[in-house]
């Protein structure tokens, strides 16, 4: 259950085509591919609920209704499983509908992460000053990272972005942080962000991973930035715009991250 000190809404961009996982994703959305026996989107829902969120705004394409349907109740299936003595499996089927309240947000065209996040603005309540973004591709350790990000926001204010260190040779695949030290070894002040820089131009080897705790002002910034390659709106460009206007950003370093 959400409380006054927790994030209320978590936005999950899930409209991508999943091309890295073809041919499996021809018919099964990437977000429903299992990590062991649990779909990635359900793991995200669990993480969001653990951070106190009450609402999961899932941004999907018109052809990916199955992602939202995963959170439906399946009483007929549960009844069959229980009749066969498969109570453990029945409980797993029931679990998804009990985790969090899902809300569908439709992205008609894949126009970038920033565009997907911007579409979720109407889902937020009028009094929500901040919200979270979780990317379902990234499995984060520790799983309580969002709760720690909320703590950092309460103590220092501003938005909080999760970062990991990568091999400097690979920075051109990520949004890269330009940072300054703070009194906390795990928390740095973000003074800039660069989307997929050349190796020689990268300000650090600390890169954005799939967890963001953002002030509501990001929506206005997304309306003001210009589309980049392919007409896409990049979330990092909107963040960098707000940083240039002296909006406070910090980042918290994760222990590890993986993509599935």
Language-model features: where?
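N-terminal glycine-rich phosphate-binding loop and ensuing alpha1 helix
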Residues: 2-82, 147
């Amino acid at each position: 259950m959400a409380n006054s000190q927790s994030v209320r809404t978590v936005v999950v961009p899930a409209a991508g085509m999943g091309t890295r996982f073809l041919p499996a994703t021809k018919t099964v959305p990437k977000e429903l591919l299992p990590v062991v026996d649990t779909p990635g989107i359900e793991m995200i829902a669990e993480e969001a609920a653990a951070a106190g969120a009450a609402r999961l705004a899932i941004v999907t394409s018109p052809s990916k209704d199955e992602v939202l349907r995963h959170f439906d109740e399946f009483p007929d299936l549960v009844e069959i499983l229980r009749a066969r003595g498969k109570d453990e499996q029945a409980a797993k089927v029931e679990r998804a509908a009990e985790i969090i309240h899902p809300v569908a947000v439709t992205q008609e065209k894949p126009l970038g992460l920033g565009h997907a996040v911007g579409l979720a603005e109407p889902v937020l309540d009028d009094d929500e000053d901040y919200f979270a973004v979780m990317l379902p591709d990234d499995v984060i350790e520790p799983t309580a990272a969002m709760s720690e990000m909320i703590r950092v926001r309460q103590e220092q204010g501003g938005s909080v972005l999760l970062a990991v260190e990568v091999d400097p040779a690979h920075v051109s695949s990520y949004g890269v942080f330009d940072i300054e030290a703070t009194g906390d070894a795990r928390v740095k002040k973000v003074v800039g962000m660069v989307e997929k820089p050349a190796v020689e131009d990268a300000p650090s080897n600390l890169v954005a991973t799939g967890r963001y705790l953002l002030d509501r002002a990001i929506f206005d910034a997304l309306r003001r930035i210009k589309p980049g390659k392919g007409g896409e709106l990049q979330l990092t460009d909107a963040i960098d715009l707000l940083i240039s206007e002296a909006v406070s950003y910090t980042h918290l370093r994760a222990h590890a991250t993986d993509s599935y």
